[in-house]
Amino acid sequence: TGLWISSGSGGNAARGILKKFGLYGLIRLAIPMLPEGMKAWLDVLCFLALGNILYCGWVAMRQKDLNFLIGHSSVAHMGMAFLGIASLSLVGVTGAVTVMIAHGLLAALSFGLSGYLYHQKGSTEINQLGGLLKRMPFIGVCLVIAMLAGCGVPGFANFAGEILVLFGAWDTLPWFVIAGAWGALLIGAIYCLRAIRNILHGPLSDENQNLCDANGITTKLPFVVLVVLLILFGVFPRLLTDKISSSASHLIPASNVGTAQLEPHSNEPLLGQLSPRAVRVRF
């Protein structure tokens, strides 16, 4: 399904929504109804999540079309959310839902930028989009922000979710966390930074001299709103995590053995601020 979603322009809605249906079903149905079954299949689920992160990231790294690159990388992000759900911990599930929300914002921003480039150029082939930062500074800056958020750079909502996923999964299977973290970091950095270099930098070809940057409030406003939300939820993750953790606490089995547990500190809300004062994870 992920490979099909990554290929066609008609799957933009599916990229942002459809992949989350299965993960939402795991949280709402599989964990509450079959908690012991989830525990029995814990190793297999974590292995599948790790394979998704590494394989889809590797495939994204080999893409020569911006739409394909974004599509495959979005499937890899869902692997990180899957890892948080498979950890069967409140921290991990909260991080997984945060990743899903951040991915929805990032997918809208990324494919919106890709669609604008296609409207201007008629193609999203990366080798035909060199030097665009000179002609399209606004779109270029938004694309850099989208790529950095996709890499999991601190300050964006994706980082807040991914770090909670890694904390939640660490006590269960630390080697999976190490492999997943390094794999997502290295592979994601390679394809995102390579896309920034090939699309925005380098010489501007004669064919791209007539390209126009985004003009007018109606064109810029959607991109600005998505960028602001990604940064807002990255700097203040408690806007999401407090509500998510309070709801997820009713779904996670109370008898999770060997998974990360939350230790509330004083009267502060559970999770949220990524600091020892707000959350303590027992390793």
PLM region spans:
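Interfacial and helix-entry/exit segments of alpha-helical transmembrane bundles
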Residues: T1-G16, G71-A81, L106-G188, N208-L229
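Divalent metal-coordination and catalytic microenvironments
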Residues: K20, D65, V75, H103, ...
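Alpha-helical transmembrane segments of multipass membrane proteins
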Residues: L29, M33, L54-W58, A81-I85, ...
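Helix-coil boundary and interhelical linker segments in multi-pass alpha-helical membrane proteins
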Residues: I27-W41, A81-V99, A169-V177
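Short juxtamembrane and helix-loop transition motifs at transmembrane-helix boundaries
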Residues: W4-G11, R28-G37, V59-R62
